[in-house]
């Protein structure tokens, strides 16, 4: 999928219109619902429901399974980038350096970046202004 064709599914448009996302963004729950409109299982975890070590384990386990993916909702400012909340996939975890590789969906502006696990966790452990929940 791309940001342009994600909403081509009629079921997806019933959940949330792309115009709304362009204007105000998307919450973690909404993302889970949108992904569920495609025949996939999406599990939503908020940082307030887990802890850093559990997050490491969940992501490492998920990355070891073919056909599984991890998307993170994080506050860009907390990892030294511009703007606010953002969602991007994690491509890898390096246990030796304790860093995650984020493949930014805005690759025209942000190249892939290795982020310390603790820094990413702090960026996720911020409140989403729309949902009032942590990311």
Residue ranges and their predicted role:
Residues 36-43, 64, 95, 125:
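Sec-exported extracytoplasmic/periplasmic mature domains
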Residues 95-135:
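Noncatalytic regulatory segments and standalone regulatory/sensor domains
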Residues 19-28, 46-50, 83-84, 89-93, ...:
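Short, exposed beta-strand "edge-strand" segments with a Pro/Gly-rich flavor and a Y/T-containing core
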Residues 26, 30-33, 54, 58, ...:
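Extracytoplasmic/secreted proteins, especially bacterial periplasmic and envelope-associated proteins
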Residues 43, 69-71, 135:
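Ordered hydrophobic segments in well-structured contexts
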Residues 50-101:
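Active-site-adjacent substructure of cysteine-protease-like catalytic cores
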Residues 1-50, 132-133:
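Cysteine-nucleophile protease catalytic domains, especially the papain-like/related folds used
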């Amino acid at each position: 999928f791309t940001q342009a064709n994600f909403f081509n599914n009629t079921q997806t448009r019933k959940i949330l219109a792309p115009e709304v996302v362009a204007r105000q963004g998307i919450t973690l729950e909404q993302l889970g619902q949108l992904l569920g409109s495609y025949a996939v299982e999406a599990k939503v975890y908020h940082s307030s429901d887990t802890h850093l070590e559990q997050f490491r384990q969940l992501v490492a386990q998920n990355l070891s399974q073919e056909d599984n993916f991890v998307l993170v909702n994080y506050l860009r400012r907390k990892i030294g980038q511009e703007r606010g909340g953002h969602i991007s996939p994690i491509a890898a975890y390096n246990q030796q350096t304790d860093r995650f590789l984020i493949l930014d969906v805005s690759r025209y502006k942000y190249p892939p970046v290795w982020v310390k696990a603790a820094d990413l966790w702090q960026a996720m452990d911020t409140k989403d202004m729309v949902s009032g929940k942590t990311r």
